[in-house]
């Protein structure tokens, strides 16, 4: 929904603040000065990151100078989205925008000493969370371009750890997670990655252990300029 401020036919009425030419056109009742208080430190405002998924929202963000955040899709599906943003931003700014610029990717992450331990400690919790998310979305966002899933009685019958893990999870050993992140860097020229380990139901100590392993064993081995990396917290 979109709103107009002030509303049509607005008339300023305030006992403690009478109409003034300083902020109001007293003939038309048009407010000339209206702003957010307190104002942002950065001018005109901090960089804005818009959550996007469909082509229309991706293009709109690029055309209006907004950065974007993406989450669930597979690498192949993300490639198309990254290209849509790059092409729209290049046209809007009249320059060759490199793939990956202005995009941040969110990935669910859980690092453990073994692949089996990662699944045991966090697998059930990420699936339960995804059942809640996908109750509304279905599984379409998890599919590769052109992929067709077999028909099932219920729309989430295929949703299990094996289905999810290969598509978009950074779950496993430090070495596995490093390789998956480097794949994102190689295929998408990924420049911004956000990770999340605190899924509903997960043990707090396990979550903190995952984050520590990510900071200590994953970040130092990612093929990124270390000056651009902030540790997970």
What are these language model-derived features?
Residues 111-115, 203-213:
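Short glycine/threonine-rich loop-to-helix capping motif typified by GTGT followed
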Residues 72-75, 196-207:
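Glycine-rich, proline-tolerant flexible connector loops at the mouths of alpha/beta enzymes
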Residues 48-51, 66-70, 101-108, 193-195:
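Hydrophobic faces of well-ordered beta-strands that scaffold small-molecule active sites
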Residues 1-39, 76-190, 223-233:
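An alpha-helical appendage that flanks or caps ligand/catalytic pockets
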Residues 212-224:
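Alpha-helix-loop-beta-strand connector modules within alpha/beta enzyme cores
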Residues 40-47:
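A local structural motif
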